[in-house]
A protein has these predicted regions:
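Long hydrophobic alpha-helical segments typical of transmembrane helices together
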Residues: 180-206
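A local structural micro-motif
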Residues: 28, 175, 196-197
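GST-like domain detector, emphasizing the conserved glutathione-binding G-site
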Residues: 1-126, 130-133
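GST-like fold's C-terminal all-alpha helical module
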Residues: 97-190
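Conserved residues at the C-terminal ends of beta-strands
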Residues: 56, 161, 200
Length: 206
């Protein structure tokens, strides 16, 4: 049995849940609160952060490696294409999501969840929104003429969908002018895996 230590609204955890759902895999979820130092997570992961996934003595503490593992073990080619050019594309987009898009959206999310709305730093939010528009434009060009970011719904789509989903939850969804990206996200939201993997809640300041 796969065990996933996770925080429900963490985009790294969300993308892993999406992959598990797309592969129709059963797993046990251990939920961790924001800021909690869970003893098992501290023991299994050198970073002390979620997600952490274990199965039959195999421990994986990096979300991208989790998708590699799931693809290799349960669905060769389902998440990571086997053709070299498409594999490079999917892995590059996955990295873009984790590093560049993640850094852009984290500023907005952190500001909105860490303090009441009346205390938000609007300069931080406006800059994050400008950066998000740049990312949307770039992604819109990458998805033009394609149904998914890979040859089928896979690792890049899981990663990007989770990031965009978090942005939408904090009031910064895909803008309609980015028609290709908007169409893609609407299609993702109709997939059964989206509902199955959707967070049970999002952190916010009261």
């Amino acid at each position: 049995m796969i065990t996933l230590y996770q925080r429900t609204d963490c985009p790294f955890c969300w993308k892993v849940r999406l992959a598990l759902a797309e592969l129709s895999l059963h797993y046990e979820c251990v939920d961790i609160r924001l800021g909690e130092r869970h003893p098992v997570v501290q023991e299994l992961s050198p970073s002390g952060t979620v997600p952490v996934m274990s199965e039959n003595g195999i421990v994986v503490w990096e979300s991208g490696v989790m998708l590699d593992y799931l693809d290799r073990r349960y669905g060769p080619g389902r998440l990571i294409p086997t053709a070299a050019a498409e594999e490079v594309r999917v892995r590059s987009l996955h990295t873009y999501s984790d590093r560049l898009l993640g850094a852009c959206l984290f500023k907005l999310v952190k500001e909105k969840r860490s303090r009441p709305a009346a205390e938000w730093d609007q300069d931080v939010i406006r800059q994050a929104q400008r950066d998000w528009r740049v990312c949307q434009q770039w992604l819109d060009a990458r998805i033009a003429g394609r149904e998914f970011f890979g040859p089928q719904f896979g690792a890049a789509d899981c990663a990007l969908a989770a990031r965009v989903g978090v942005a939408a939850a904090y009031g910064a969804g895909v803008e309609r002018e980015f028609t290709n990206l908007y169409r893609w996200f609407e299609a993702v939201r109709r997939r059964p895996a989206w509902e199955a993997a959707y967070p049970t809640g999002f952190a916010s300041s009261k």
